[in-house]
Every structure is written in structure tokens, then in C-alpha cells.
Curated annotation (Swiss-Prot):
Zn(2+) binds at C63, C66, C92, C95. Changing A14V: 3-fold reduced binding to Rnp1. The lineage of its organism: Archaea, Methanobacteriati, Methanobacteriota, Thermococci, Thermococcales. It catalyses: Endonucleolytic cleavage of RNA, removing 5'-extranucleotides from tRNA precursor. The gene is rnp4. This is Ribonuclease P protein component 4. Binds 1 zinc ion per subunit. It is found in: Cytoplasm.
Amino acid sequence: MAKYNEKKEKKRIAKERIDILFSLAERVFPYSPELAKRYVELALLVQQKAKVKIPRKWKRRYCKKCHAFLVPGINARVRLRQKRMPHIVVKCLECGHIMRYPYIKEIKKRRKEKMEY
């Protein structure tokens, strides 16, 4: 039982550190984008070592290819597309990598809320 609690505690600490590193990257980005990139890389190392998932709010804020911290309008272009399946297109302006995130769940949720009224 002690090993289970110890493992759980390590994962909690890792998630906390990931959150701290990403919030530091967000705060320091306007002054030093390279330092923000380093914070993202450190957060990814912590995540890999502890085998935990990065929270969704941070997962979409860095480039999967060059690990740059993405800020829409500065080093990332964000577009909404409806073709085939509704999705968000995020293009990293540092390396040119394109990431697509579907948002069907959000649309279904909105429809459901509309039907309830």
C-alpha cells in the first residue's frame, strides 16, 4: 500500500511542476521566448519521466515539433475550419508545423444546451 501512495504522490508533484513550468513560460514569453521554450522542454521531460499527461489547457499551447511556447498572433496562427469535420488549425510560425484539434464535443454541447431551453 505504501508503494501505491508513494507513486500517487510522485505523479501529483510532477503535475504540479508541469503546471508551474508552463505558467512560468507564459509569464516570461514576452521578454524571453527562448527561456519560455526551455521551460516547455523541462515540463515535457518531467512529464515523460513521471509518465503523466499534460493538462489539456497546456497541451495546446506548445508546438509538438520545435517545443516553442505558442502565443496566438505572435508566433502562432489560429484558424477555425468547417470542412469535413469542424476543427481548429494552429500553425507554428517558428517551424511551420500545423496542428489540428477537433471541436465536435463543444458543438454538440452547445446544441444540447440550446435544446434544453
